[in-house]
Structure formats: C-alpha cells, structure tokens
Amino acid sequence: MKPLFLQIKCELGQTFKVAADFIDTVKETSEVYSTSGAYDLLGKFYLEEDQNVGRFVVEHIHRIPGIRDTYTLMAFRIFCDEQPDGLVERG
C-alpha cells in the first residue's frame, strides 16, 4: 500500500460534511483532520501499489460535493518508532 496525503479546501460551511463524505464513501480513507491555514482538511489515504494517483483523485475525491481545491502530497517513507513491517527506520 502506498500512502497519499491530500490537503482539501472546502466551500464555506461544508468542511464537516466533506470530511464525513470521505469517511462514508472513499474506502481508501485512513484519517481526515480539520486544519488551520490555507486548507480546511488533511486526508490520509492508502492506495494499492498499482493504483493510479491522478485517477484516484479525479474519480474519488473531486466528485465529492463541497470541495473547492485539493493539493496532493505523495509520501515515500514513514519514520517512526515501529514500522508496519516491524523494521525501525532511523537515518
């Protein structure tokens, strides 16, 4: 699985509905956070290794009503105390 982060700008008053729609309808959703700054939400998604990121964003994210803009961030490696595969990544 490959992680994908999306910053999401919502129409005024639609942030909570958009977040709920992600959780209810996009199976790849891992977490959705409300944020301060230029974007209203930060979504974390896990895609299959062969899944096309651009197609996923267009077909699954942009179709949700209330979204005004998105910014896609690709993640390559996780650094934490415990890796999902049991390995620790330090430097």
Where are the predicted features?
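A compositional/biophysical signature of low hydrophobicity enriched in polar/charged and small residues
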Residues: M1-G91
